């Protein structure tokens, strides 16, 4: 086997990291203060479980952290892991929210998945967890 063939058979760095998809968090630096964090992920992709066609969405995450805060590179790589996943819009939004809640235990969290129109249909799925506190 040539070195080129050996390299081709090994997953690329990005593919390995995406496959791991670990949501890493760090301690909230100000747990006594209510505040909100807004994260936008404009390049979410998954596959339609019915047609196999790609679906594209902007994910908008707004949350009030509890004991832990989500690390940004980790959430990017986690979201990228959905690229080849056959999943409905509704299940994608709910599963992502569930995984984020387990990882960081927020006081309150809302995820909006704004999917690009396909076939003249525009879908926005909004899911939430917990009770929003005044900041």
Curated annotation (Swiss-Prot):
Please give the name of this protein. NADPH-dependent 7-cyano-7-deazaguanine reductase
Q: Where does substrate bind?
A: 70-72, 89-90
What keywords are annotated for this sequence in UniProt? Cytoplasm, NADP, Oxidoreductase, Queuosine biosynthesis
The UniProt entry's GO biological process terms, in alphabetical order, are: queuosine biosynthetic process; tRNA modification
- Recorded E.C. number(s)? 1.7.1.13
Q: Got any disulfides in this one, which pairs?
A: none
Q: Give one Pfam family.
A: QueF
Could you tell me which InterPro entries the record lists for this protein? GTP-CH-I_C/QueF (IPR043133), NADPH_dep_7-cyano-7-deazaG_red (IPR050084), QueF (IPR029500), QueF_type1 (IPR016856)
- Pathway entry: tRNA modification; tRNA-queuosine biosynthesis
Q: Which domain of life is it from?
A: Bacteria
Compartment annotation:
Cytoplasm
Q: What does this protein do?
A: Catalyzes the NADPH-dependent reduction of 7-cyano-7-deazaguanine (preQ0) to 7-aminomethyl-7-deazaguanine (preQ1).
Gene3D superfamilies, sorted: 3.30.1130.10
In alphabetical order, the GO MF annotations are:
preQ1 synthase activity
Q: Sorted alphabetically, which NCBIfam families does this protein's record hold? A: QueF-II
Q: Which reactions appear under catalytic activity for this entry?
A: 7-aminomethyl-7-carbaguanine + 2 NADP(+) = 7-cyano-7-deazaguanine + 2 NADPH + 3 H(+)
The family this protein is said to belong to: Belongs to the GTP cyclohydrolase I family. QueF type 1 subfamily.
